[in-house]
Amino acid sequence: MQEVNSSENLKTAYDNYYENNDETWRMLGAKYKVEHIVEVCKGYTFNKVLEVGAGDGVILKLLSDRNFATEYHAVELSASGVERIKERNIPSIKSIQEFDGYHLPFGDESMDLIILTHVLEHVEHERMLLRELKRVAKMVVIEVPRDYRTGVDTRIKHFLAYGHINVYTPTSLRYLLLTEGFEIIKDLTDTIAPEVTKFYTFKTLKKPKNFVSTFKIDLEHSIKKVAASVFGKKLEEKFANYYTVLCKKAEHQPDIF
């Protein structure tokens, strides 16, 4: 059987991304990803933490600032991302390695926690990666954007512009994890914070900023939060922009047929 690695065009795309991407924008997005990681991991302590698809290292930097773990490790598909991580001089980071997207250079159950945040939607062979995470990690945190909507097949150009070749809902991600032999410990959903929407709207898209436009962003966020709290989990997941789950290897693997 031919060995599977990430395609060369995918590696090139991410090399270009980390060379050219806006540091302020990535730091802002990472701020909330870290909040989700910390929240879903409450009650647990970790010695060795590995981030798979660590990008430019901003998430590990913010976790290190919060003393989230004793030591950190990073693997990243792109050479430019690896260099950016090294430039951050993150305290307690023990290894920074480029990898092929599917094979982790670590032993079985050698990591207390693996973090995979906003990576799975970009992965060509998602189940292969999940099996490798399950081999190496005692626990795993996964976060994905909630991309799926009715008519998603008519918006392929939109999602591919962000590199999203897979789309998820909370239920579809849970199904994927359960059928790959994971046990879900804790999960959460969240909406895009107003400051993130404002940055993207006014800085990235360069739309005019005024009282009405900023008020609409704040109002939409508040309505979603209130509606979700009143009408429960089903509506909360429908309105969500992010889904975060803490999981581990299940004691019993699912049977097929």
Name every feature range the model reports, one short phrase each:
Residues 81, 147-150, 191-193:
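Feature marks short, surface-exposed loop/turn motifs that line or immediately flank catalytic pockets
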Residues 127-142:
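A short glycine-rich, Lys/Arg-flanked "PGG" loop and its adjoining helix->strand segment in the class I
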Residues 113-119:
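A short beta-strand submotif of the Rossmann-like class I SAM-dependent methyltransferase core
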Residues 143-166:
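Short, glycine-/aromatic-enriched active-site segment of Class I SAM-dependent methyltransferases
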Residues 186-220, 241:
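Conserved catalytic loop of SAM-dependent methyltransferase domains
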Residues 122:
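Di-metal (Zn2+ and/or Mg2+/Mn2+) metal-binding site signature of metallo-dependent hydrolases
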Residues 165-181, 186-187:
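Short alpha-helix
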Residues 1-107, 113, 130, 163, ...:
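Conserved N-terminal segment of class I S-adenosyl-L-methionine
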